Amino acid sequence: MTTLMGSYSWTEGLDCSPIDEDLSDGLSPHRSPREKGSETRIRRPMNAFMVWAKDERKRLAVQNPDLHNAELSKMLGKSWKALSPAQKRPYVEEAERLRVQHMQDYPNYKYRPRRKKQIKRICKRVDTGFLLSSLSRDQNSVPDTRGCRTAVEKEENGGYPGSALPDMRHYRETPSNGSKHDQTYPYGLPTPPEMSPLEAIDQDQSFYSTPCSEDCHPHINGAVYEYSSRSPILCSHLSQVPIPQTGSSMIPPVPNCPPAYYSSTYHSIHHNYHAHLGQLSPPPEHPHYDAIDQISQAELLGDMDRNEFDQYLNTSLHDPSEMTIHGHVQVSQASDIQPSETSLISVLADATATYYNSYSVS
């Protein structure tokens, strides 16, 4: 092994004499690059406080070995402020001497403060992908309450069933479910205003469709009605009015339409029209139809002017198109019923229709 090492010249550099010289000077044989850089850097001259604290710090460290260096610095600062100018004067003069000496030793010295390493602040920002995914999930779900919820609460509570954004066509196609509409209509969007009965009748004209052609209903003054009711509100006092379903038909028959068409259309016309009228505020005093049944027919006919209702009773002399008043079909009775009963039922039905038509128009 020694013969191999002796054959190379690099073994001559393994002399320990320089290390011994460094150790004799009191310097560490192993120096890190940071320590070498600190020695080459020129230190600033000490001020008066540093000159005074150099010895005072050692004295406090001996008296209080358990105190941290920061606590010692606080104590030194309070003690320095407590000194009088006369006590500070020798330290101020010593600091001035050191400054002049520093200027002579380093004439080209310029103070360059060290750049402190800035700690990178971790910004707690929510990922944009998470926000987009939560937004898309919120658009497909309906929250339980109208209160705002954070993204974390939505993750814990999970999704919500139902469609959050139903189109307006769904609202128009399913208006009969009044209670369901309040639950399925999206939160955050303005609800459509309530329609008046007259506006509802005008809008119903464009949404009606029947299996028959347009000539199936030429005698309803051009007004068409939708079969399904648009309002769950019913006029309870109108339900007691007897509507005859036997005898002559209210609408003249058309050869293109089946017989079942007239009964369903006639029922939907009255039901839908009275349903819209039910949204209006009731008149001050409602007529009590229960009491009318108890009154004899003679008393009722005695209080009325029969000549006034001749145009309604004599239906054979009028054209069928004149049997409507503002889209409401007049009620008549079959010819096989007694004349007194026919007049009573017709008068009551026509008077009721005239009253509510005039009330809705006004």
UniProtKB/Swiss-Prot annotation:
It comes from Xenopus tropicalis (Western clawed frog). The keyword DNA-binding applies. It comes from the Eukaryota. GO terms for molecular function: sequence-specific DNA binding; transcription cis-regulatory region binding. Residues 42-110 bind DNA. Signal peptide: none annotated. Residues 21-41 are annotated as: Disordered. This is Transcription factor Sox-7. Transmembrane segments: none annotated. Expressed in the embryonic pronephric sinus as well as posterior cardinal veins. It is found in: Nucleus. Residues 32-41 have a biased composition (Basic and acidic residues). The lineage of its organism: Eukaryota, Metazoa, Chordata, Craniata, Vertebrata. GO terms for cellular component: nucleus. GO terms for biological process: endoderm formation; heart development; positive regulation of transcription by RNA polymerase II; pronephros development. Residues 245-362 form the Sox C-terminal domain. PANTHER family: SOX TRANSCRIPTION FACTOR (PTHR10270), TRANSCRIPTION FACTOR SOX-7 (PTHR10270:SF210).
